[in-house]
Amino acid sequence: LIHHIALAFAAALLTHDALSAQPAKQSPYPHATETIGSVRQIYDGVLTPEMAISTFRNIDRLFPVRSVPRSSNPMPLPRAAVPLRTIRFSDGGKLYDLDSYLELNRVSGLLILKDGRIKLERYRYGNTGLTRWMSMSIAKSLTSTLIGAAVKQGKIKSLADPVTHYVPALSGSAYEGVSIRDVLMMASGVRWNETYTDAASDRRRLLEAQISQKPGSALKVMGSLPRAAAPGTVNNYNTGETQVAAEILRNATGKSLATYLHEQIWSRVGMEADANWWLESPDGIEIGGSGFSATLRDYGRFGLFLLNGGRVNGESILPERWLQEATTPKVLRDGKAQDYGYLWWTGTTPVSRRDGAYSAEGIHGQFLYVNPAARVVIVVWGAQPEPLGGAVINDWAFFEAVAGALR
């Protein structure tokens, strides 16, 4: 069955790739005139529920962006013959259904794909198929995947290479002696405070550098940080690591992240809409850990690309076994295990471990969940005003229930 699914996926890609049509003109963006909040309000968690919605679907108005052009021939996403109408599941001893999940977790968009077909597609709060929604840290997993593509192309020789080989500006900083693998595991040992609502945290320092829109300001923040532990020995969630990863990518490939994403994935997989990616400064480098926005279906297509092993038309975009390595729990240099891959979250329950399930996750309730065993992809757009703690229901409980029901 998996073989036939892979062949069908490849055939669909081959069909649209062989055509020579130019991209159809896109409709005007339906939310372009909405009033929005500020990026500081996003991270402070003080937006009203209504303002959070309008802001989250207009983040490309907060900073300069670089476009990731759509494909000239979008990959079809056919609807399943039998749609998923509801799901019942338990979490924390309580019973829930699909509607309660959508309402209690303030889900503004939900896409469920099984074997490449749409089992459920739901938009809320005025969103439509044209809406671009913020990724938040789902962008980190995009950056990780582009690192894999650069390794495949030989632009990056090895994950064991030192960061400073590709980013000499960090020579003499706490990133001296840190490998690319350490960065992907968020285990550089460089001191970092990720607290979103603390204006004095390192995460907010990085955000202020972005707000300044001065070229090189984000890298300057990363180069100023002290060491807290030996490289590769402590996992500490650190958005700054992904800005270092972005610098590695740009210097290794000689291209912007948006251009490289378009060339390697966006155009080849067959995305139907342009995406946008925040920049550190006008015409500068992308923000490697945040600020990406795309349509619900295109997030889903990215999930299908992963589900198909990172292959397009039979060609591997990623190194052999890259996804298995990137999306499974890693072991630190001192032998300690962590429930984290290469900028991907790994399943922690026995069921998720059995299925090899993994996810990209962002604050305010953003998820891209992939279950290779069940052949399921789930995209969740969250409209939670608070960066963390806004979900009533454990999202992974919902994901596991869906994957189980669709086996």
What does each model-identified segment do?
Residues 4-16:
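Bacterial N-terminal signal peptides
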Residues 14, 18-128, 156, 185, ...:
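N-terminal leader/targeting segments and the immediately adjacent pre-domain N-terminus
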Residues 87-88, 93-101, 117, 128-130, ...:
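Active-site-proximal loop and beta-strand segments within enzyme catalytic domains
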Residues 116, 133-159, 183, 245-249, ...:
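Active-site SXXK
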Residues 129-130, 195-197, 204-282, 290:
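Catalytic-site signature segments of enzymes, centered on catalytic residues
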Residues 134, 153-191, 224, 252-289, ...:
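Active-site helix/loop module of the DD-peptidase/beta-lactamase fold
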Residues 241-248, 288-312, 366-382:
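Active-site-proximal alpha-helical segments within enzyme catalytic domains
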Residues 271-276, 324-377:
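Active-site Gly/Thr loop motif
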